[in-house]
Design a protein with these regions (language model features):
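N-terminal periplasmic/intermembrane-space "pro-region" immediately following the signal or transit peptide
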Residues: 6-116, 161, 175, 468, ...
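A generic structural signal for ordered secondary structure
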Residues: 17-20, 28, 38-42, 132-137, ...
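Bacterial N-terminal signal peptides
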Residues: 1-2
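Outer membrane beta-barrel
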Residues: 79-112, 118-265, 270-277, 281-288, ...
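Outer-membrane beta-barrel pore domains
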Residues: 104-107, 119-120, 158-159, 170-177, ...
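Alpha-helix initiation/capping motif
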Residues: 11, 51, 56-58, 208-210, ...
Length: 473
């Protein structure tokens, strides 16, 4: 009994086969439903673009190759510079000079007087000699601006004539190349005549400029157009001298040439004639890296002399000399000079000298007419530099000489000047310094006296003690 018959076994096999077929059909149905569900849920795939054939660029420059060799990476293009705001383009600085002068001794012939310092004389004491504000900056890559007013200017003719604002410098430098070797300077600026004239008053050791060179250009400045050529290595020379505190004259080119009105800074032009000036300077190093310059300069033009009534030789009524602008000489008189310069910077001993010759307007011996006469003069100075634990000491001695017409003064008085100066500048810091100078002088008082029977232009001989406190900011 315990065995299955043949017919029953066949029926069981057919039933099992039917179940398997049904399961397989259901599985296929589920897979199809899953496929359709995935297609609805997943986005269509983006077709892959065809691969471009490789280009052989090995023969091109490295910066053009797509895959340069190792160690020769393709340079990265720099991002464009961010434009600066207007107040980020400019710097503001300045300095103030407070003076006190005392006449120690006088021979009594002429009153004490210095062209460059109105506080030398009777009834004088403290004076704000300069109050300068300097604004400068780059307007663009090739144009820079320089503006310097003085708030200690004086206006003649009134007891409250001091401490007025007056423009000293207002010019633009237009650079013709990226290295700034070639540039035009347009506006009111210093005339490139005389190394000491070009040197800033904040850097000069003597309190005033020498008369021979300074009498060439009133206020050292004028309105005009100047061209300067300054090779890169010369720019570096001037920059080093300035940064090292050697009291340089600034960057006025290895070569400069220009035209200007001729009457002097802050004065109106009086004739239809331009002055022409040219200057060359050769900076060099000598003896263990010391720095020096040699130079030559000259100018030519017609100068209109302004006048004031005087009593000729102190006899008779006061009259205006002939040959002056107010005496109908509107074209002016011949004005020409040539000068030489040598400067050895104080490292630690220095020497500085300039000499000029020429022809220019000068009052004649009878004091009745202004005529063209010869002139000559100059100066020589030795100085030293001693660094202290705090600050510096700079002693100096200078001889100053001039014989000729002082054209920028009324009536261009014939002046005879010879003086010796012994001084010491003590720099407590970069922002504070004190200069003390003893002066032994014999010079012409260039003040025109309009009273009848009163002689103008007497000689002043005497001794001066002069002090100046300078604050730089």
């Amino acid at each position: 009994v315990g065995f299955i018959s043949t017919s029953e076994a066949a029926e069981a096999g057919d039933s099992f086969t039917s179940v398997l077929a049904d399961l397989e059909r259901r599985l296929q149905q589920v897979e199809e439903e899953n496929r359709m569900l995935r297609e609805r849920l997943e986005p269509a795939s983006t077709p892959t673009p065809p691969t471009e054939p490789a280009i052989d660029d090995s023969g091109l420059p490295v910066f053009l190759q797509q895959n340069p060799p190792d160690g020769q990476a393709k340079p990265v293009t720099a991002e464009p510079k961010k434009e600066k705001k207007w107040f980020e383009k400019y710097t503001v600085r300045g300095y103030t000079q407070l003076r006190f002068n005392d006449v120690l001794d006088s021979d009594g012939r002429g009153a004490a007087h210095l062209v460059g310092d109105s506080s030398v004389g009777d009834r004088q004491s403290f004076l704000l000699r300069r109050v300068r504000l300097i604004i400068q900056g780059d307007v663009s890559e090739h144009v820079s601006l320089y503006f310097q007013p003085d708030f200690a200017a004086s206006v003649p003719g009134s007891p409250d004539n001091a401490q007025y604002a007056q423009i000293r410098d207002m010019y633009a430098d237009v650079h013709l190349d990226d290295l700034k070797e070639l540039r035009f300077r347009i506006g009111q600026s210093k005339v490139p005549y005389g190394w000491e004239n070009l040197q800033s008053s904040s850097n000069r050791l003597p309190l005033d400029r020498n008369d021979a060179m300074n009498s060439a250009v009133r206020n050292e400045r004028d309105l005009g157009i100047f061209f300067y050529w300054t090779p890169v290595e010369v720019q570096e020379f001037f920059k080093y001298v300035n940064d090292a505190g050697l009291k340089g004259s600034g960057n006025y080119g290895l070569f400069g040439v220009g035209v200007y009105n001729g009457q002097g800074g802050s004065l109106r032009e009086q004739n239809d004639n331009l002055h022409t000036v040219a200057r060359i300077t050769l900076p060099f190093e000598y003896g263990n890296g010391r720095h020096a310059e040699v130079g030559m300069q000259g100018y030519v033009g017609q100068y209109a002399v302004l006048s004031a009534p005087i009593s000729p030789l102190g006899v008779g009524a006061a009259v205006r000399p002939s040959g002056t602008l107010e005496a109908n000489n509107e074209q002016g008189l011949q004005d020409e000079r040539l000068a030489w310069t040598f400067v050895a910077y104080p490292e630690p001993i220095g020497f500085q000298a300039e000499w000029t010759v020429g022809n220019g307007p000068a009052l004649n011996a009878a004091q009745t007419a202004v005529e063209v006469q010869s002139l000559s003069g100059g100066y020589a100075m030795v100085m030293a530099r001693r660094k202290l634990r705090k600050g510096e000491l700079l002693p100096f001695a200078r001889w100053n000489y001039f014989n000729g017409g002082y054209k920028s003064e009324r009536n261009a008085p014939m002046s005879n000047i010879e003086e010796w100066e012994l001084g010491l500048e003590w720099q407590f810091s970069k922002s504070l310094e004190l200069a003390t100078v003893y002066t032994l002088t014999d010079r012409t008082n260039t003040t025109a006296l309009s009273s009848a029977n009163t002689r103008s232009y007497q000689q002043f001989e005497g001794q001066l003690l002069r002090c100046q406190l300078q604050v730089t900011w």
